Design a protein with these regions (language model features):
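A short helix-to-beta-strand connector/capping loop
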Residues: 7-10, 46
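C-terminal active-site subregion of NodB/CE4 polysaccharide deacetylases
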Residues: 24-149
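Sequence-level motif detector for i,i+2 pairs with an aromatic at +2
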Residues: 9-12, 97
């Protein structure tokens, strides 16, 4: 599967091995997790320069001018693009260590079932009320207001 995805142009990134919160984890935990990701996942998908922050949690918080030890360690491991979670287009180039900080949308089952505000964030791409199949997991419910015709 990985070979076919690569052949058809897919790019892989890391989301850490254990989905750890990078803003509250110790450097030692981040190092152990990163090693495990490189050994068990990176060895399959190949090198990547992209790290998608689990929970959207930046290791240096929201201060893009700060470059602490965890961020530096991750950069030393080859990561250059660091993507958090956000609803607007955001990017910052950190010229002191050659890194791009940006936000990304994360459409998933949770956002498909979110309230009107949440599904509004994705309305430029789709309307959750038109595409979600509620018969698959009927007991999960939704928080949005049904469409009126």
């Amino acid at each position: 599967i990985i070979a076919e995805l690569k052949r058809t142009g897919w790019t892989f990134g890391s989301h850490t091995w254990g989905h750890i919160n990078l803003s509250s984890s110790s450097l030692e935990r981040v190092q152990a997790d990163t090693k495990r990701w490189l050994d068990e996942v990176g060895s399959l998908v190949g090198p990547t320069t992209i790290l998608y922050y689990p929970h959207g949690a930046r290791p240096d918080g929201d201060d893009v001018k700060q470059t602490g030890p965890i961020f530096r360690y991750l950069q030393e491991q080859g990561f250059r693009v660091f993507a958090s979670v956000g609803i607007s287009s955001y990017s910052k180039i950190k010229t002191d260590i050659c890194a791009v900080i940006c936000d990304r949308l994360h459409p998933d089952g949770t956002t498909l079932r979110g309230n009107d505000k949440v599904i509004g964030w994705y309305s430029q791409f789709y309307d959750a009320r038109d595409i979600i199949d509620l018969t698959v997991r009927p007991n999960r419910g939704v928080k949005w207001t049904p469409k009126t015709n």
